[in-house]
Design a protein with these regions (language model features):
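Beta-strand elements of well-folded, non-transmembrane domains
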Residues: 69-71, 90-92, 118-120, 138-140, ...
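N-terminal beta-strand/beta-hairpin edge segment
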Residues: 57-144, 148-170, 182
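Short amphipathic alpha-helical segments
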Residues: 36-43, 143, 219-228
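Hydrophobic membrane-targeting and insertion signals
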Residues: 1-78, 93, 267-275
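Short secondary-structure junctions
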Residues: 52-61, 166, 237-243
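Extracytoplasmic/luminal low-complexity segments enriched in Pro/Gly and acidic/polar residues
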Residues: 201-275
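Short helix-loop boundary/capping segments
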Residues: 169-219
Length: 275
C-alpha cells in the first residue's frame, strides 16, 4: 500500500504542469510587452530631446507615450503598430515678446497632443504614421512675439507712409483670450489701439478676421491686419507645414489648432523652426 502511494506521488499532476508552463509563458509575454513599450517610449523621447536640443531648446520633461490596447510585441513581426498617442512637452523659451528692448527671440516648440494611426516602427527613433492628428497649444506670448518679429522685419513695405511710420513704433503688447466669444483682443503699445482677432479655418488653412481697430483715432486696417496675420497665422503656418488645419479654437491660454496629416514622420511633428 505504501509503495502504491509512492508511485502516485511520483506520477504528479499533468494538468498542474501545463498550467504552470502557461503561467510562465504568460508572465514572459507580459514582461516582454512592458519592456518593449518602455524601450519604444524611451527611443521616441530621446529622439524628441535630441531634436530640440540641437536647436538650442532646453527639454525638462520627457514625451509621454501611450500605445493603448495595441499589442506591441506583435509589431516586432509586422513592424507596424495600430496606434500611438504622444504628449510632447513645451520647450518654448520666449525672450522679450513685447519687443520692449529689441527684437523678441523664440526658441523651442509648443506643447502638443499627437495621435498616430498605423505606425511603421522600422525606425524606432522616428516612426512614420499613415495618419497623424496634432492638437498644438499656442500661448499668447508666442503669438505676440511672432507678430512683433514679423511686422518689424516687414516694416517699410506696405506702400503707405503713415502705416510704415506707425508700424515702426507700434508693437503688439497683449493678446487677451475670450473663449466664450471665440476672439483674442489685441492691444497695441500698451493701449494705443485695440482690436478683436477671430481665428477661423479657411481652405484647409488658418485665417484671421479683424473686428474694429484704429491707431491714434485714425483707421489703420492694413497695419492691424499685418499684426493679426503675423500673430495668428504665423505660428500656425510654421507648425502646420505638411498638414491641413482641421480646427482652431481660442483657449484660456491662447489658441489651440488641430492639424491633420498623412504619411508623416514623428520628427516632422515635434518641432517648429524659428529664426
Amino acid at each position: 500500500m505504501n509503495a502504491k502511494r509512492k508511485r502516485t506521488k511520483k506520477r504528479g499532476n499533468p494538468l498542474g504542469v501545463i498550467v504552470g508552463v502557461v503561467l510562465v509563458v504568460a508572465l514572459v509575454l507580459v514582461v516582454g510587452e512592458i519592456a518593449l513599450r518602455m524601450f519604444l517610449g524611451k527611443e521616441i523621447s530621446d529622439g524628441f530631446r535630441e531634436a530640440e536640443q540641437s536647436r538650442g531648446a532646453v527639454v525638462s520633461e520627457d514625451v509621454q507615450t501611450s500605445f493603448g490596447s495595441n499589442p506591441v510585441l506583435l509589431a516586432l513581426l509586422t513592424s507596424e503598430l495600430g496606434g500611438m498617442n504622444l504628449r510632447t512637452p513645451s520647450t518654448l523659451q520666449i525672450t522679450d515678446p513685447r519687443a520692449e528692448n529689441g527684437a523678441p527671440q523664440i526658441i523651442g516648440s509648443p506643447a502638443a497632443d499627437v495621435t498616430l494611426t498605423d505606425v511603421d516602427i522600422s525606425n524606432t527613433s522616428d516612426p512614420v504614421a499613415s495618419r497623424v492628428e496634432v492638437v498644438a497649444e499656442l500661448p499668447s506670448d508666442l503669438m505676440i512675439a511672432d507678430a512683433n518679429i514679423s511686422v518689424s522685419d516687414a516694416t517699410g513695405g506696405s506702400g503707405n507712409i503713415f502705416e510704415d511710420l506707425v508700424s515702426s513704433a507700434v508693437r503688439l503688447t497683449a493678446l487677451t483670450p475670450h473663449p466664450d466669444r471665440g476672439v483674442l483682443t489685441a492691444e497695441f503699445s500698451g493701449g494705443l489701439a485695440t482690436a478683436d482677432l477671430r481665428p477661423v479655418v479657411r481652405d484647409g488653412g488658418i485665417a484671421v478676421e479683424v473686428e474694429g481697430g484704429s491707431v491714434l483715432g485714425v483707421q489703420a486696417d492694413g497695419l492691424i491686419s499685418r499684426f493679426a496675420d503675423a500673430a495668428v497665422t504665423g505660428p500656425a503656418q510654421q507648425i502646420g507645414h505638411g498638414f491641413t488645419v482641421a480646427g482652431v479654437e481660442v483657449t484660456d491660454g491662447g489658441m489651440a489648432i488641430t492639424l491633420d496629416g498623412r504619411d508623416i514622420a514623428l520628427s516632422s511633428v515635434s518641432a517648429i523652426e524659428y529664426r
